[in-house]
A protein has these predicted regions:
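A structural motif corresponding to the C-terminal lobe/cap of the Radical SAM core domain
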Residues: 1-152
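Membrane-proximal basic amphipathic "stem/tether" segments
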Residues: 139-172
């Protein structure tokens, strides 16, 4: 059918964060088995991950990047938790006095707009940037590429990621 790539919202690997985010559907998922199955079908994976959840700590960035590389996730999009207006998350954070900005242009998943619990706002922003730079480092691109079972998938991963790497100046 021509399916070459799939966007998967992993969100977080923390059961506590999944529960507090009402992402109960993710709790019983075997991510590793799903990734292996998709790779066996030749499907590349764009993994999406969220940082800044209430149970995150300073090590969440390294753990997330390491997991993505270990399981040969082709591309990753990292996000800072963003409590969009009109959502339950925003309403709860507003009730708790945690909203720090009402400048809607900052609600972009790259900017911290609330009082974090497990990390400082600066740690969250720095960790988010670290995750991008490390996931897309040449050493990790090669490492993830060679995690595939066959040369065709290894080369596809390597060339696809190399293409992403050339756009790095635009997100720095």
């Amino acid at each position: 059918a021509g399916l070459r790539s799939l966007f998967l919202g992993f969100e977080t690997f923390s059961p506590d964060n999944l529960r507090s985010s009402n992402k109960l559907q993710n709790l019983s998922k075997d991510y590793v088995a799903a990734v292996k199955r998709l790779h066996s079908l030749g499907i590349m994976i764009n993994g999406s991950f969220v940082f800044g959840l209430d149970h995150d700590d300073k090590d969440v960035f390294r753990r997330t990047v390491d997991w993505g590389i270990e399981h040969s996730i082709t591309t990753a999009t990292f996000h800072i938790l963003t409590p969009y207006p009109g959502t339950r998350l925003f309403q709860q954070m507003e009730r708790d006095g945690r909203i720090t900005s009402y400048d809607w242009s900052q609600y972009d998943t790259r900017t911290v707009v609330y009082k974090t619990l497990g990390l400082t706002a600066e740690e969250l922003k720095q960790g988010y940037e670290w995750a991008y730079h490390n996931f897309y480092s040449w050493s990790n691109i090669f490492k993830a590429s060679f995690g595939h079972d066959n040369i065709k998938q290894q080369l596809a991963h390597l060339f696809y990621m190399g293409g992403w790497k050339k756009f790095e100046p635009f997100w720095n």
